[in-house]
Amino acid sequence: MKQFILILFFIISSPVLATKKDSIYIPKYETQYTTLFKSEEFFCDACGCAAGNGSSGFESLLNPQFIGIKYFAQHYKAKENLFVNDLTQDQYYNTLQLWGKIPVTKKLSIYGSLPFQFHEKKTQQGDIKISGIGDASVMGIYEILKSKNTFHQLSGGLGVKIPIGKFDEKGITGVNPSFQLGTGSWDYQLALSYKFQKNIFALMLNTDYTIKTENKKQYQFGNQWNYAATGFYSLWRNENSIFSGKLGLQGEVYDWNKQFGEIMPRTAGSALYGKLGFEVSYKKISIGSELMLPTYTNLASGDIEAKSRFSLFVNFGL
């Protein structure tokens, strides 16, 4: 992908006015309820390549300011080597990360994460495992627009990925060069998030673009574009708790990797996932989970096939 165009989604809807007789709105609970869909975040907790990049899309968090722990698992099928046609090798990418979002001003927040990676691929010669600290990420999130009389909100983000995780040059010789703890490079992210909310329903539209630079080994992973549309529906609530379900689509597009400035063949690709999940909050504690299954996958020119993704997080409001 040689060029990228950020897409600004804009949806117009008439405002909905609530009265005291409206059973959806309870004055004591209203402040907590209006934050339900507030924190659809931009984040790619990534290694950063055609598969195994660790992108979980955009998180929806019940607490607008929090610290927490998240587990994220991915499963791929890959060719054993470049000389066979069958996808027989199972690859598992696992991430356990600390993350948080802290407000700086009314409109500006800082979002960050530090992952611990433990990956495995099952080869004909035996299992290969790697583990260790991954690349840290920091992003500033700014509320660009929030209408007073409707439920429209637009936010933007600028972020950087810090190369803390180990990059092993030997790992790029296999079918999947992203079997790494980190990219070894400073990478930069641009993001947009649009929210429409009406009563107990919300729709989130998100897009982000990651610019990946060349590392010290003169290897450069391809730039990455993520996009997602997620619908949320409040299934149950009382004065202290909310339980919501979510359903959506998430897509990812990857440019070619490069080494010594030359394009590496069979490294670009794309995938589209359907996702289903839930989120529950009790006072300042929130728990969420999500399952993602591919509806389309063409990673590394077909040498890698996405199988599934699963995530689970526990957050504590500040």
Question: What residues fall within each predicted segment?
Answer:
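Short loop/turn motifs that connect adjacent beta-strands in outer-membrane beta-barrel proteins
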Residues: K20-I26, K38-E40, S56-P64, K107, ...
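Extracellular loop and loop/strand-boundary signature of outer-membrane beta-barrel proteins
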Residues: S55, L82-D86, K121-I128, V175-Q180, ...
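Residues on the lipid-exposed face of transmembrane beta-strands in outer-membrane beta-barrel proteins
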Residues: S56-F58, I69, L98-I102, G112, ...
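Residues that define the transmembrane beta-barrel architecture of outer-membrane proteins
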Residues: N63, D90-L96, I130-A136, H152, ...
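Outer membrane beta-barrel transmembrane domains
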Residues: A78-E80, D86, Y219-L318
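Outer-membrane pore/translocation modules
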Residues: H119, G126-G222
